[in-house]
C-alpha cells in the first residue's frame, strides 16, 4: 500500500512500477501508481480537511511541524540511507540533505512571520491591518535530485500557512516520498491535510488538471514546467510556482589561487554528479597564461574523480546519476557537442556498463555555433574562452535560462558590474554556484522560473494577502466630501 489518502494507506490502481538502485540494480520499492479516480479522491480529502486545518491556531500547526522535525532527527540515519540508495548519491551527501530538511522547519516558521505575518498601522480613526490567508488545496510536485529536501521546502511552509496538500514525488524516487510521508503521519497530521499519490506523467497530468485545485508548486525540468504553465493558462485563480533548471555560467576572470578556483569549479559543476539545478554548465575562462594553467589543473583534478556506490568506504565525492538512462543522455550530449566542433578536454566515461556511474566530462566550445541552449543534467562542463570582461557577461547572459551565475575574481568592481548586468536570480562572487543561503530567496528568471522564488520567499506563494481598514466605532466624519448635505430639514 503506497498511497496515503485521507489518512489511510491504500494500494494504487494504476500502472505497476518498481524502483531500483541505479548502480547495483537492487530492487528498493514496488507499488502502483494512483489512477485518475484516486487522484481526485486525494483532492476531495484535502478539500474536506482544509476548513478545519486553516482555522487551527498557528501554534497548533507549528507544533505538528516541529514534531516532524524531531522525527527527522530521530530517523536521520534511516532516511539518509533511503535517499542515498534510491538516488545513488553518497551517504555523506544524503546526510546533508536530511540536515537541510530539519533546518528548514525553524527557517520556515521565521519566514512565515517575517513574510506573511500580521502587520497593523494605526490611523487617526482606526487601523490598517495586513493579514494572510491560505490558498486552499495545493499540489506539490517533487524532483528526484533532492527528493527529501526540495519537496520539504514547499510542504512545510504550505502547511504552516494553513493549506492542505497533495504530494506527488518523482516517479524516480517513490521510496523517499513514502518514507517522508510516514514521518508526517507519525507527527500527527489530521486525515486529509497531506495526501500522497505516486506515479509518473499520467498521474501528474491528472493532478494538474483538477478543477478543485487552488495551486501547484513545482520543482523540476523546464520542459515539464512549461507544460504545466500551458495546462494552467487561463486560470488566474490558481497559484503556480515553478522552479526549473538552468544553463548556468561560471566566469573565471582571475584565478590567482588556482587550486582554490579549481575546487570552487568542482563544487559548482560536479557535485551531486552534476544533478543540481544551480550547477555550472558553462565555464567562461579568460584567455591567457593564467587561464591556461587553471584549465590544465581543472582537467587534472577532475580526471581523478571516481564515482562510487552510496556506501563505499572511503566515501566518493560523487555517486551515480539517477539512472543509467540519465548517464547515457550525458554521453549523447557530449558526442553532440563534439560533432558541432567541440574539443574534448576530459572525456566522460561510464565506469560500468548498465550502471549510472559516470566520470566527469569537460569540452571546449570556443567559437562553436549552434550549441543547444539546454540543461544537461549531469557531470558535463562546457568551456568558452573570452578576452574582455564585457564579453564574459555577454556570454553569461546568452541563454534563455536565468537561475545562477558566478564570478571568480579579486576585483569588487567586476562583481558590481555583474550584479547590474547579470540576468540570474542567484549571483555569487568567489563562492560555488551550488551554494545558497536558506535565509535568501531561491529561484530564477526566464526559463528557470516564473518569479515565484522559494526558500525564504516560499511563504509568499503559500498565502494571499488580505488588507483591512477597521474601526471599533462607526462615526460621521467631521468634514464631509463636497456635494454631500447632511443638514436636517424642518418638517413642513
UniProtKB/Swiss-Prot annotation:
It catalyses: N-succinyl-L-glutamate 5-semialdehyde + NAD(+) + H2O = N-succinyl-L-glutamate + NADH + 2 H(+). Keywords: Arginine metabolism, NAD, Oxidoreductase. The keyword Nucleotide-binding does not apply. It holds the Pfam family Aldedh. SUPFAM superfamilies: ALDH-like. Its EC number is 1.2.1.71. One of its GO terms (molecular function) is succinylglutamate-semialdehyde dehydrogenase activity. Gene3D superfamilies: Aldehyde Dehydrogenase, Chain A, domain 1 (3.40.605.10), Aldehyde Dehydrogenase, Chain A, domain 2 (3.40.309.10). Pathway: Amino-acid degradation; L-arginine degradation via AST pathway; L-glutamate and succinate from L-arginine: step 4/5. It comes from the Bacteria. NAD(+) binds at residues 220-225. It is an enzyme of class 1 (oxidoreductase). The keyword Oxidoreductase applies. The active site is at residues 243, 277. GO terms for biological process: arginine catabolic process to glutamate; arginine catabolic process to succinate. PROSITE patterns: ALDEHYDE_DEHYDR_CYS, ALDEHYDE_DEHYDR_GLU. PANTHER family: ALDEHYDE DEHYDROGENASE-RELATED. Catalyzes the NAD-dependent reduction of succinylglutamate semialdehyde into succinylglutamate. HAMAP family: Aldedh_AstD. This is N-succinylglutamate 5-semialdehyde dehydrogenase.
Amino acid at each position: 500500500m503506497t498511497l496515503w489518502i485521507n489518512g489511510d494507506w491504500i494500494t494504487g490502481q494504476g500502472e505497476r512500477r518498481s524502483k531500483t538502485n541505479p548502480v547495483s540494480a537492487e530492487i528498493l520499492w514496488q507499488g502502483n501508481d494512483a489512477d485518475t479516480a484516486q487522484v481526485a479522491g486525494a483532492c476531495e480529502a484535502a478539500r474536506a480537511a482544509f476548513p478545519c486545518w486553516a482555522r487551527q491556531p498557528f501554534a497548533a500547526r507549528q507544533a505538528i511541524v516541529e514534531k516532524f522535525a524531531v522525527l527527522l532527527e530521530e530517523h536521520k540515519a534511516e532516511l539518509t540511507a533511503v535517499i542515498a540508495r534510491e538516488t545513488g548519491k553518497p551517504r555523506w551527501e544524503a546526510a546533508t540533505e536530511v540536515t537541510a530538511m530539519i533546518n528548514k522547519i525553524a527557517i520556515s516558521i521565521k519566514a512565515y512571520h517575517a513574510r506573511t505575518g500580521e502587520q497593523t498601522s494605526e490611523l487617526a480613526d482606526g487601523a490598517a491591518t495586513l493579514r494572510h490567508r491560505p490558498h486552499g488545496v495545493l499540489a506539490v510536485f517533487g524532483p528526484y535530485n533532492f527528493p527529501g529536501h526540495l519537496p520539504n521546502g514547499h510542504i512545510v511552509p504550505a502547511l504552516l500557512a494553513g493549506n492542505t496538500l497533495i504530494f506527488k514525488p518523482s516517479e524516480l524516487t517513490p521510496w523517499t516520498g513514502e518514507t517522508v510521508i510516514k514521518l508526517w503521519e507519525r507527527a500527527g497530521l489530521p486525515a486529509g491535510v497531506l495526501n500522497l499519490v505516486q506515479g509518473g506523467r499520467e498521474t501528474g497530468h491528472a493532478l494538474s488538471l483538477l478543477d478543485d485545485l487552488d495551486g501547484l508548486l513545482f520543482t523540476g525540468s523546464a520542459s515539464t514546467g512549461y507544460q504545466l504553465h500551458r495546462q494552467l493558462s487561463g486560470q488566474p485563480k490558481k497559484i503556480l510556482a515553478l522552479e526549473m533548471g538552468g544553463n548556468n555560467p561560471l566566469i573565471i576572470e582571475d584565478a590567482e589561487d588556482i587550486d582554490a578556483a579549481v575546487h570552487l569549479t568542482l563544487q559548482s559543476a560536479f557535485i551531486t554528479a552534476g544533478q543540481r539545478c544551480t550547477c555550472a554548465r558553462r565555464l567562461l575562462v579568460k584567455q591567457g597564461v593564467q587561464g591556461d594553467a587553471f584549465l590544465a589543473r581543472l582537467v587534472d583534478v577532475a580526471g581523478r574523480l571516481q564515482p562510487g556506490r552510496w556506501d563505499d568506504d572511503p566515501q566518493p565525492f560523487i555517486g551515480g546519476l539517477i539512472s543509467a538512462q540519465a548517464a547515457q543522455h550525458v554521453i549523447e550530449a557530449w558526442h553532440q557537442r563534439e560533432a558541432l566542433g567541440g574539443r574534448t578536454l576530459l572525456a566522460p566515461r561510464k565506469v560500468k556498463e548498465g550502471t549510472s556511474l559516470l566520470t566527469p566530462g569537460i569540452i571546449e566550445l570556443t567559437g562553436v555555433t549552434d550549441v543547444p541552449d539546454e540543461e544537461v543534467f549531469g557531470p558535463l562542463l562546457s568551456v568558452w574562452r573570452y578576452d574582455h570582461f564585457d564579453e564574459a557577461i555577454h556570454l553569461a547572459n546568452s541563454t534563455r535560462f536565468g537561475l545562477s551565475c558566478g564570478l571568480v575574481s579579486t576585483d569588487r568592481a567586476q562583481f558590481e558590474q555583474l550584479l547590474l548586468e547579470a540576468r540570474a536570480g542567484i549571483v555569487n562572487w568567489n563562492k560555488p554556484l551550488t551554494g545558497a543561503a536558506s535565509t535568501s530567496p531561491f529561484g530564477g528568471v526566464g526559463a528557470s522560473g516564473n518569479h515565484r522564488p522559494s526558500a525564504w520567499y516560499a511563504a509568499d506563494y503559500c498565502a494571499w494577502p488580505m488588507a483591512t481598514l477597521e474601526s471599533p466605532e462607526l462615526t460621521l466624519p467631521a468634514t464631509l466630501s463636497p456635494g454631500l448635505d447632511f443638514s436636517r430639514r424642518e418638517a413642513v
